[in-house]
Amino acid sequence: MPTDLHAWNALLRHHDTLRDAQMRDWFDREGAQRVAQCSLEAAGLYLDYSKNRITPQTMSLLMQLAAEAGVTRRRDAMFAGEHINTTEDRAVLHVALRAPAGAAFKVDGEAVVPAIHQVLARMRDFSARVRSGAWKGATGERITDVINIGIGGSDLGPRMVCRALSHLADADGHAAPRMHFVSNVDGTDLAETLVRLDPQRTLVIVCSKTFTTLETMANARSARAWFVASGVAEQDLAKHFVAVSTNTEAVREFGIDPANMFEFWDWIGGRFSLWSSVGLSITLAVGFDAFSDLLAGGHAMDEHFRTAPLERNMPVILGMLGVWYRNFWNLPTSCMAPYSTSLELFPAFLQQLEMESNGKSVQLDGQRIRTHTSPVVWGTAGTNGQHAYFQQIHQGSQVVPVDFVAPLVPPRRLPGHHAKLLANCFAQAEALMRGRSADELRASGLKDEVRIAHMVFDGNRPSNTLLMEDLTPNVLGALIALYEHRTFVQGVVWRINSFDQWGVELGKILARPIEAELTGTATGQHDASTAALIARARAVLKAGAAS
């Protein structure tokens, strides 16, 4: 149990000494020295973690905890291709996907980098053909729209990257196709996408590891029916469909030529898969060179994580700060606030990455864990969040650690805008740390004590600030890899498997017979609430079918 470790118990005692300490006092005493001690750069990212409820002793104890928990040993096992995903008996080697051609990564004794780069070469050639107009639809039309059909890791990661790098869509001189992402089995998602498109100019990527994912295959079948209804012959569907999968036979049975299938491997978890052929949509959206730079940025962060000492290791520092707040301050949520509209989907991506990885209550040895694991992760882009939930972050009864992320140069420039954006980002972090006291309000001339009470900001609320010079594919890759490794570090400390997701399985199993009940006459065994919901829905569905 992590709670049995010496450093864990030392941190419990240390936490008691900091309960009433104020960050503003530390800044008043230490000034620039504190910032120098609590900041570092790696792979194009600058991290300032000085606005945290930490002292040098805190960080020393957190690094001791990381060492005692085996972060270094577990990290090295991951990079060595060991089967650290124990419940599925698989290696976890997404880091190999972004390694250069000469790198040596093996799974079960087999070198995997050559196969990875063969797939990358196919992705490069295919994306070049589509973006240049050489790939034609059934009637010889150029492809102007691409739909990525997938869910979870087959959607969130590629969608986030395509949004973040949309300013580079035409950077290689080609007119990029418009990108559309469909994930929800709710037919509205697909229908509202198709209604805007010309089937003769549309290409569909069906993205599913097993090619059996319920939502993805339902949407894929409906998309195929749309093409056929528009006059595209079955034999011509190959010009409008490609697959990203590990299941060649299922791809063939669906009607997609296996020659148009881009493979990946079962040692890649869905939420870590955007670096693989799952990122095919990224190559179509911004070009293969940008995708290659994304991989290089991720690899740069991998090398930092693999080689930097714990106390100067950015993923380790962020991971251990997360443990500090979750387990010693008992804070149940954390907020991601990117001050960049281009990064507006990053909080949703991070939500899946952290909560699906570390939302566990059982240790690797099968024992129930005796402490908290993943916080609830949420957030939106700034400055929008300031006019929604920042009231709670500043004055609510629950402290919420915040990660601010901002590019110093905007992807798209309008005079005067970016200075305002950055000013708000830095001001929010400062206000969270420093707060505003009753005495300061009185000194400003306020005399109404009731109003003063409402205007007091306690401050002492923690945040990290991550800056990048500008939002390039390279630095975006580093940012994503940073949070991947941060999540991994926390999972090691909690002694959980961050690479399975059994919690999503039971609902899928129960949904199958319920669907049959909704569309037929069968009646299953359910609790009274679920039975009543099924009966109500079935009555409405039958009435609609009869009308």
From Swiss-Prot:
The Enzyme Commission number assigned here is 5.3.1.9
CDD domains with a match to the protein in the record = SIS_PGI_1 (cd05015), SIS_PGI_2 (cd05016)
GO CC annotations? cytosol
Pfam families, alphabetically? PGI
Q: Where in the cell is it found?
A: Cytoplasm
Any single biological process term in GO: gluconeogenesis
Chief localisation class: cytoplasm
Pathway where this protein functions? Carbohydrate biosynthesis; gluconeogenesis; Carbohydrate degradation; glycolysis; D-glyceraldehyde 3-phosphate and glycerone phosphate from D-glucose: step 2/4
Keywords from the named record: Cytoplasm, Gluconeogenesis, Glycolysis, Isomerase
The residues responsible for catalysis, as annotated, are: 356, 387, 508
Q: Say which enzyme class the record assigns.
A: isomerase
- Tell me one GO molecular function of this protein: glucose-6-phosphate isomerase activity
Reaction equation(s) it catalyzes: alpha-D-glucose 6-phosphate = beta-D-fructose 6-phosphate
Q: Which NCBIfam families is this protein grouped with? A: PRK00179.1 (NF001211)
HAMAP family (UniProt xref):
G6P_isomerase
Role, per record: Catalyzes the reversible isomerization of glucose-6-phosphate to fructose-6-phosphate.
Family to which the UniProt record says this protein belongs:
Belongs to the GPI family.
Record-given protein name: Glucose-6-phosphate isomerase
Q: Which species is this UniProt entry from?
A: Cupriavidus taiwanensis (strain DSM 17343 / BCRC 17206 / CCUG 44338 / CIP 107171 / LMG 19424 / R1) (Ralstonia taiwanensis (strain LMG 19424))
